[in-house]
Structure formats: C-alpha cells, structure tokens
Amino acid sequence: YYETENRQKGRKVAVTVSAAAFVPKPFTPFQWFGQDTIEMLERKQKLLRESTFSRKLTVNYHGAETSFLEAVFARGDRKLNAVILEAHKRGMRFDGWADCFDFDAWMQVFKDLGIDPAFYANRQRSFDEVFPWDHLDYGIKKEFLIEECKRAYASETTPNCREKCSACGAACFKGGLCVEKRC
C-alpha cells in the first residue's frame, strides 16, 4: 500500500480475482478426475464475466483451450511424444505466450496423428487403471491417494500430519520417519 506512491489513497478499492480451470495432475488425489470440457469451462468463465457487476472488480482466468492442453500433457503417455515432435516440426514455439498460441494448429496435429486429446484430459479414470507414471516412486503410496480421493468426494479433510500421521508414505521415503514412527 505504501509503495504505491503514484496512486491516490483513500476509499477507492479495486479487487482482482483470478480463477484457474481445474487441471487434473499426476501424483495427486485428483489424478482420477476428468477435466471439464472446453465448452463447460467457457460456460463457467462466461458466468464469471457476467456476474461481475462492478468496475472495481476484475476477474482474470486462464484460457479454456490452454487449460485443456495442459490437462492433456499432464496426464498423457509416451504417445504424446509424437504430438510434441510434430508440433515442433510445424513451427509451433512459445505456445505458452497467448500471441503465439494456435489451438486449432494443435488440434490438427492430434487429428493428423489419430490421437484423441479428450481421452487424456476429460476422461474420468478408475482406481484400478495403470497410469503412465505409476512406475515412478515419489514416496506417496497410490493407496493413500485413492483414500484421499474418496475423502475429497465426501468433502472430508485429512488431519495435519504433525498432529496425526495419515500413513501416506512420504516420511518413509529415503529413510525418513513419520511423526508417529508408523513407517
């Protein structure tokens, strides 16, 4: 507040709200969830825009198409190597920058290679599905993530691990000890 010397101080307030689309990520309890479709994300963003009645409130959000591709590559497998290579061959660079991002070009690459990106981004997954990243040992047990996912569906929280060990497996990784030494 005090560092904004060039701004008028007083009762005028401007609020900026940033809302990101949910992107399911590996190694989390939400890796089994499907992402909303692009159409649903755009509908939700439109609702946010139309709900903003004050000029003092700004709502920012990540583009639905960018979020979709983020989910595709976050939950993808080695088949997506061909997509990335082909996109590079077609001159796609710096796609994290809005002025360089061409969603239709990405969709054309997927189509030309016969790969359905919605299979990776939008599909709800079962607990017994084998993920491309399951062979990686990052300390947290998959069984724990499944239980956390079930807790999320039930709107339940997990106790703080400093108060009660949830036996996630993280503290046992590389010889560590859980708070309650359950490992």
Question: Where in the sequence are the language-model features?
Answer:
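Short secondary-structure boundary/capping segments
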Residues: 30-40, 73-80
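Switch/connector loops and helix/strand junctions flanking conserved nucleotide-binding motifs
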Residues: 26-29, 69-70
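Conserved C-terminal portion of the radical SAM core fold
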Residues: 1-26, 40-64
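Generic secondary-structure boundary/loop-capping signal
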Residues: 19-20, 27, 128-133
